[in-house]
Amino acid sequence: MKQHRENLPIILASSSPARIELLNRIKIIPSQIIPADIDETPNLRELPAPLAIRLAYEKAIKVASQVEESAIIIAADTVAAVGRRILPKATTYEEVKNCIKMVSGRRHRVYTGLCIIKTENDQLTVKQKIVQTIVKFKKLSDEEINFYCSLDEGRGKAGGCKISGYAEAFISFISGSYSNVMGLPLFETANALTSLGFKVY
């Protein structure tokens, strides 16, 4: 899993274990993990997709401003929504429960904003992408909802759901990138890196 010597170092602007794991799947090991501490509050009437891409860009730019050496910075932000309603990154049992009730028996969308910045010779090259995945949960009983919430795996996740966990047992339909729902669309990430001269293969 060694990077090509001629590649610039990769800096991941996130401490998310899922994003680290996803990069490792395509044989990329970040040389640094620098979480970007930004205000993730949506603007008034801000829609889910614009929110995701804005936050990803703000994360990438913040980390780029802290890095002196040439590098490639990868940042992402994942937003779940039912229609135009943005679901929170649930932090409490009640928030997880409310989110799961919202998506029970219906389709919802997961957006990941991807922003990759190449900083070299005091110049920034920015690549941005918004990726959407449609996910449908079966109609859940109160018992199933309570059981899922008791697992505590949805805390800190967009929409209160960890797709790579027990929630997979509830998903009846998915259209689009699975890795996107986990937090980093790998196809788009690899393409963006390649366009910046990074040898993924």
Curated annotation (Swiss-Prot):
It catalyses: a ribonucleoside 5'-triphosphate + H2O = a ribonucleoside 5'-phosphate + diphosphate + H(+); a 2'-deoxyribonucleoside 5'-triphosphate + H2O = a 2'-deoxyribonucleoside 5'-phosphate + diphosphate + H(+). Pfam families: Maf. Its EC number is 3.6.1.9. It comes from the Bacteria. Its main location: cytoplasm. Its cofactor is a divalent metal cation. Transmembrane segments: none annotated. It is found in: Cytoplasm. The active site is at residue 77. GO terms for biological process: nucleotide metabolic process. Keywords: Cytoplasm, Hydrolase, Nucleotide metabolism. GO terms for molecular function: nucleoside triphosphate diphosphatase activity. HAMAP family: Maf. Nucleoside triphosphate pyrophosphatase. May have a dual role in cell division arrest and in preventing the incorporation of modified nucleotides into cellular nucleic acids. Belongs to the Maf family. This is Nucleoside triphosphate pyrophosphatase. It comes from Rickettsia akari (strain Hartford). The lineage of its organism: Bacteria, Pseudomonadati, Pseudomonadota, Alphaproteobacteria, Rickettsiales.
